[in-house]
């Protein structure tokens, strides 16, 4: 199973007191939190699979800086970030198809590892061929990941408690 994260996980934090941003919604903060949560989910899913004998492989990937419409249509579109983006984009980004390669690597490569995280191998992981990516310390917090798992199960009504071990 591959979870799609982002370089934005690096500045993310899980706000357990306002997990769904109902008291204070800031788009970039919510995006960073969601991408951190996706990476934490991937790592926690692998821990739980290992412990329960589910026999699945969970990892994550990020596209680097792929040329999509995220910045053009997201918060602050046509602001300073958008103008800087337009200026430097040709030098620091890659096509959307190239951005998909780390996800394909994580899903199909025999070199992909459980609890692995993959992204572009270039400058600041912005572009380049797929390679192991840096996982920030907050994503490795097993206690926070377990708490997030439990809260997610409660909010969604989905539980994995009855999933049998792989035969």
Q: Residue spans of the language-model regions?
A:
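Short, exposed beta-strand "edge-strand" segments with a Pro/Gly-rich flavor and a Y/T-containing core
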Residues: 11-15, 134-140
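Short glycine/proline- and charge-enriched loop/turn segments
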Residues: 17-25, 78-86, 127-135
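Rossmann-fold NAD(P)H-dependent dehydrogenase/reductase core
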Residues: 1-78, 155-166
């Amino acid at each position: 199973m591959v979870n799609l994260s982002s370089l934005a996980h690096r500045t993310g934090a899980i706000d357990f007191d306002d997990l769904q941003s109902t008291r204070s919604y800031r788009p970039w903060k919510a995006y960073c939190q969601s991408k951190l949560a996706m990476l934490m989910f991937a790592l926690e899913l692998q821990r739980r699979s290992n412990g329960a004998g589910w026999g699945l492989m969970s990892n994550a990937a990020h596209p680097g800086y792929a040329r999509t419409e995220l910045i053009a249509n997201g918060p602050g579109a046509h602001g300073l970030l958008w103008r800087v983006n337009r200026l430097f984009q040709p030098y620091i980004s890659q096509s959307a198809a190239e951005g998909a390669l780390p996800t394909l690597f994580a899903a199909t490569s025999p070199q992909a590892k459980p609890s692995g995280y993959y992204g572009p191998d270039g400058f600041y992981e912005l572009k380049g061929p797929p390679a192991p990516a840096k996982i920030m310390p907050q994503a490795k917090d097993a206690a926070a990941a377990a708490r997030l798992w439990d809260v997610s199960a409660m909010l969604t009504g989905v539980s994995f408690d009855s999933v049998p071990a792989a035969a």
